[in-house]
Amino acid sequence: MSALRLIVGLGNPGPEHAQTRHNAGFRFVDALIERSGARWALDSKLFGETAKVEVAGQPVWLLKPATFMNLSGKSITAALRFWKIEPEHLLVAHDELDLAPGTARLKFDGGHGGQNGLRDTIRLLGHGKFHRLRVGIGHPGHKDRVVPWVLGRAGREDDAAIGAAVDAAIDVLPLAMEGNFNEAMKRLHTEKK
């Protein structure tokens, strides 16, 4: 499996969206920034904020699109082109309705599963052959409640669980950085007793 060179967190920009469930991807890359001591810098040609950090001694670019969720592919494809990175070296972190808060899952390839940031990225790339980190936010129970759910803030317990899932994903990230994605998946997906 290919080593990672670009990690993107999906979300919506602006303080009004900062703590929403939909910004679980932003939360992941922000946690990486916090651990590394790096800082975000706005890069208008890439339509987002960028930073370069090291994980397990490997350099990796981080990106937070400033395009709003539904247009995330514009920023992601611009970054891939600019840094000459193939999609197989890309990890996109995003919120996942179909996983409970406290759960995070890695996968490679597939569809968008209704996630509009992934939908736009797949549309612009022409395929879904890239890595994903799915951060569980839970489902409100009925499809009519999805929009207010993802754009709303999680309660204290769910928020703590989402934070724990982000931390668990960061803990296995060195394996993925080294190209050992299957082992990273195995460790992340194994329930802690």
UniProtKB/Swiss-Prot annotation:
Monomer. The gene is pth. GO terms for molecular function: peptidyl-tRNA hydrolase activity; tRNA binding. The active site is at H22. Its EC number is 3.1.1.29. It catalyses: an N-acyl-L-alpha-aminoacyl-tRNA + H2O = an N-acyl-L-amino acid + a tRNA + H(+). The record marks D95 as: Stabilizes the basic form of H active site to accept a proton. SUPFAM superfamilies: Peptidyl-tRNA hydrolase-like. This is Peptidyl-tRNA hydrolase. Keywords: Cytoplasm, Hydrolase, RNA-binding, tRNA-binding. It is found in: Cytoplasm. It comes from Xanthomonas euvesicatoria pv. vesicatoria (strain 85-10) (Xanthomonas campestris pv. vesicatoria). HAMAP family: Pept_tRNA_hydro_bact (MF_00083).
